[in-house]
């Protein structure tokens, strides 16, 4: 089945939290490829297509799509530059661009856990007992070798490192790429979501609340321009609410009441603007006027639907679920459920979707 950014985020968060719950530490590097799509070598890409036994005619079609592309530059007041033929790069905005890049980096397999989502690459090393040494520098050398062999470039100044787990592992030696020391961060924006080394979501909630509130400005201007309540509501549902809900099943399980209230406050303000209500108007009343649910209710619904998706054996996240109970055991339970709740050692594991979603059985 398809793999979205949410699937990728859930997968890596599960790896982190289960490792931390087992008493291990996690060292993660967020890799930034310099001009990733622009540096894809056409000849190397075609060779990789052939190595994957792609039909010859399809390879020819790819070759026709990639080769003989040219570009030139024009500055206002000056004539065009000479045409220049390109031997690399993917056309911006094309459907084949992301697919081609995925094929290009498919053979990037360092000896550690790696998350690849188009041009976002994340390396994760699980470090065991306190005496265990980190091998991440070795993994980075492998990555650098691959990059050089494939005419790709790693941007050391934008590649970041994060350590999750015991504070005693913060003294791990610094990492370098091409003599550039990687910055160690406590918060990083991964696939649109701010993740932190303590696996709390305060930074992300602050970010999405601020972003959504800034868009209320446009809602007010549209109202002054005379748009109907229906059109204003459509604007909110399509432009503002998605900001508050992106990847919500990932962070909903450990959301605090205060954080949840801050999210609801944004929706309440938007509805008050649309329906000319005051701050004293009950929230439940404006929800009824708009015929929509609270954000908390929608997050629960999104989580239930994701759980139903994960339960499908062909789901890319199906392996994250605990082993199902024996049917004979299930039949003797007062409240029969297919999947048992995983046992945990720490509160960290409660933030994993596989732990939280078993409640939706």
Q: Where do the model's predicted regions map?
A:
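Active-site palm subdomain of RNA-directed nucleic acid polymerases
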Residues: 98-127
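Catalytic palm subdomain of template-directed nucleic-acid polymerases
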Residues: 36-52, 106, 121-145, 166
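Short, conserved non-catalytic motifs in the polymerase core
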Residues: 1-11, 28-30, 73-100, 124-129, ...
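Conserved pre-catalytic core of RNA-dependent polymerases
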Residues: 1-90
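Basic, alpha-helical interaction scaffolds
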Residues: 115, 180-250
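Short linear motifs embedded in intrinsically disordered, charge-biased segments
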Residues: 256-258, 262-361
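Short, conserved micro-motifs composed of acidic
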Residues: 138, 153-186
């Amino acid at each position: 089945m398809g793999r979205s950014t949410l699937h990728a985020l859930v997968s890596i968060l599960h790896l982190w939290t289960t490792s931390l719950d087992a008493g291990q530490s996690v060292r993660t590097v967020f890799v930034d490829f310099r001009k990733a799509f622009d540096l894809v070598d056409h000849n190397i890409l075609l060779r990789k297509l052939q190595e994957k036994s792609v039909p010859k005619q399809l390879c020819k079609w790819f070759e026709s799509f990639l080769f003989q592309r040219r570009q030139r530059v024009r500055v206002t007041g000056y004539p065009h530059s000479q045409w220049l033929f390109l031997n690399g790069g993917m056309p911006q905005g094309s459907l084949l661009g992301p697919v081609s890049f995925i094929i290009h980096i498919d053979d990037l397999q360092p000896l550690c856990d790696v998350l690849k989502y188009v041009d976002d690459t994340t390396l994760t090393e699980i470090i065991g007992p306190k005496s265990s040494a980190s091998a991440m520098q070795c993994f980075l050398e492998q990555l650098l070798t691959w990059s050089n062999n494939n005419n790709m470039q790693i941007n050391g100044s934008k590649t970041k490192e994060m350590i999750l787990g015991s504070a005693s592992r913060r003294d791990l030696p610094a990492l370098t790429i091409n003599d550039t020391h990687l910055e160690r961060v406590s918060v990083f924006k991964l696939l649109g979501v701010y993740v932190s080394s303590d696996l709390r979501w305060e930074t992300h909630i602050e970010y999405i609340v601020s972003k959504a509130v800034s868009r209320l400005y446009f809602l007010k201007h549209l109202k002054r321009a005379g748009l109907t309540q229906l059109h204003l509501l459509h604007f909110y549902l399509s432009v503002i609410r998605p900001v508050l809900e992106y990847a919500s099943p990932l962070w909903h399980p450990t959301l605090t009441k205060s954080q949840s209230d801050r999210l609801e406050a944004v929706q309440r303000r938007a509805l008050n603007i649309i329906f000319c209500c005051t701050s004293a108007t009950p929230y439940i009343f404006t929800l009824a006027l708009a015929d929509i649910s609270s954000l908390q209710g929608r997050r629960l619904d999104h989580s239930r639907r994701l759980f139903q998706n994960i339960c499908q054996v062909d789901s890319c996240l199906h392996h994250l679920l605990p082993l199902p109970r024996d049917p004979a055991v299930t039949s003797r339970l007062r409240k029969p459920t297919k999947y048992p709740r995983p046992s945990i050692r720490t509160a960290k594991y409660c933030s994993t979707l596989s732990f939280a979603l078993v409640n939706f059985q």
